[in-house]
Amino acid sequence: MLVVLLVALLVTRLVASLFRLALKELRHPLQGVVPSVSRVPLLGAAWQMRSFQPDNLHDKFAEYVKRFGRSFMGTVLGHVVMVTAEPRHIDALLQGQHQLKKGTMYFALRGWLGDGLLLSRGKEWHTMRKIITPTFHFSILEQFVEVFDRQSSILVERLRTLSYGNEVVNIYPLVGLAALDIITETAMGVNVDAQGADSEVVHAVKDLTNILATRFMRPHLLFPHLFRLCWPSGFRKQQAGVICLHEFTNGIIEQRRRLLAREANQDKPTKPHALLDTLLRATVDGQPLTDKQIRDEVNTFIFEGHDTTTSAVSFCLYLLSRHEAVQQKLFEELRMHYGQDLFRGVILSDFATLPYLSCVVKESLRLYPPIPAVARCLEKDLVIDEGYIPVGTNVVVLLWQLLRDEAIFTDPLVFQPERHLGEEAPRLSPYSYIPFSAGPRNCIGQKFALLEMKTMVTKVIRHYQLLPMGADVEPSIKIVLRSKSGVNVGLRPRLY
C-alpha cells in the first residue's frame, strides 16, 4: 500500500511539473511576438531536432527562416530558445553592456577551456579582457606577422609536392596544421611543429573539436552526466584530450615562467611576444594570475584561433579556385606590390596597400563565416518590437543567414569582392556584416585573425595558381564551418 502511495505521489508531482512547464510555455512573453516552430506541447521542437545534423543544419535554418521569418522561437520541455537573423534584433542583443553571457550550450567547453575569456562573465570577464587586449596592439601584431609569414612559407613548401596540376588537394587539413603552428607559437612562444611531426597535441585538438561539435548538435549531451552515460567512448576520449592539452600547457607555462624570471635579472628584458608572456606578467589587485587562470586563457586562445582560421583560409582559397577572374585580379595586385621575388616576406605595412586582398577576404568571410552562429543567454529582459524576451532566454544569432540575406546584399550567393569597395558597403547597417560577431563581446582577436588570413592567402596565391578541381564544398557546421566533402583545389606553380 505504501509503495502505491509513493508511486501515486511521484506521478502526481510529475504531472504537476509538466503542467507548470506547459503553462509556462503557453504564457511565454514571446508567444505572438515571433512565430513558434514548436507544434507539440512540452515536446516542442525536439521532434524536428531529431533530423538535425552538422551537414544539414545551415539548410534547416534557411528553411525555417523562409517559413517563419528572420526571427522565430522553439521550445523543449518549456525551455525557450529564440533564433534570429534580423539585424534589428541582433543590434538590440549585441550592442549593449547587459547581454554578455554566452549561450548555455557553450558550457560544454568548460572542461577544456575552464573560465577563459570565452566562458567567463561579469567582473572576471572585464578584468581578463582588459589584460589581454594589449596583446593585439600594433607593435605586437607586427611581431606576429613575422610568425604568420614563416609558418605560411612552410605551408607553401609542403604544397610543392602536390602542385603538378593533376591532383585534387584537400587544403583544409594542411592549412589546419599551419594554423596550429601559428596559434601555439603566438599564444605560448613555442612551436609544436604540427606541419612537420605527428604530434600528440595535434591529435588531441582534433579529437576535442570533433567531440564538442557532436555535443552541440545533441542537447542531452551538453549535460555532463548524460554525456558520460549516453556516449561513454566520447566522454573518455574528451577526458584524455583535455588531460593531454592541460599537461602540455602547464609544462609550457612553467618553462616560460623560468625564462621570464631569468630575463628579469637582465638589464634589458625582452618585450612580451606571446599571449602567455602577457599573462605571466599581469596582476589583479596586486596578485599574479594563478596557473589555472593562465592555462584557461591560453587554451581559449588556441581553441578560438585554430579551427576558425583554418576554416576561413581554406574556404577563401576554395572560392578563389572557382573564380578565375577574381584570383587573377588578386594575383596582379600582389605581383605589383611584391614583384617577382617569391622569397620576399610579408610584413604588416604591406596590407595597407593591398585593397583588393582585403575585399577578397571580407567577401569570403561573408559567404563562409567560420562561426556560422553565436548565442547569448539573457541577463535581463530585452525589448524587441511589440514585446520582450525575458531574462534567462537563450538567443541564437544566425550569422550564416544574416550574411546571405538578399534584402541586405545584392546577389547574396555570388562571390563578388568588389561589393566591399562599391556603393553597397557604406549603406550596410552596423549589424548586417558581422562575421566576427559584434558589440562588447565580439571576437577580441579579429585583427589577429584577419592578418593571419591575409598572410596565408598572399603566400599561397603568389606561389600557386589554384584550379577548380575536386568535389564542391558541402558545408558542415561542427561549431566551426567545415566541409563534408573536403575543401578541394588543384595547384599549379606560378609562372612569372
From Swiss-Prot:
Give the subcellular location.
Endoplasmic reticulum membrane; Microsome membrane
* Cofactor(s), names only, from the UniProt record: heme
Molecular function in Gene Ontology: heme binding; iron ion binding; monooxygenase activity; oxidoreductase activity, acting on paired donors, with incorporation or reduction of molecular oxygen
Species per Swiss-Prot/TrEMBL record: Drosophila melanogaster
Q: Which Pfam families match?
A: p450
What is the purpose of this protein? May be involved in the metabolism of insect hormones and in the breakdown of synthetic insecticides.
Grouped into one coarse class, the protein's main location is endoplasmic reticulum
Protein's membrane topology: Peripheral membrane protein
UniProt keywords (A-Z) are: Endoplasmic reticulum, Heme, Iron, Membrane, Metal-binding, Microsome, Monooxygenase, Oxidoreductase
* Residues where heme binds: 443
Q: What is its EC number?
A: 1.14.-.-
Q: Which GO terms describe its cellular component?
A: endoplasmic reticulum membrane
What InterPro entries does the database record attribute to this sequence?
Cyt_P450, Cyt_P450_CS, Cyt_P450_E_grp-I, Cyt_P450_sf, Cytochrome_P450_Monoox
The lineage's top-level taxon is: Eukaryota
- What's this protein's family per the entry? Belongs to the cytochrome P450 family.
User: Under what name is this protein listed?
Assistant: Cytochrome P450 4ae1
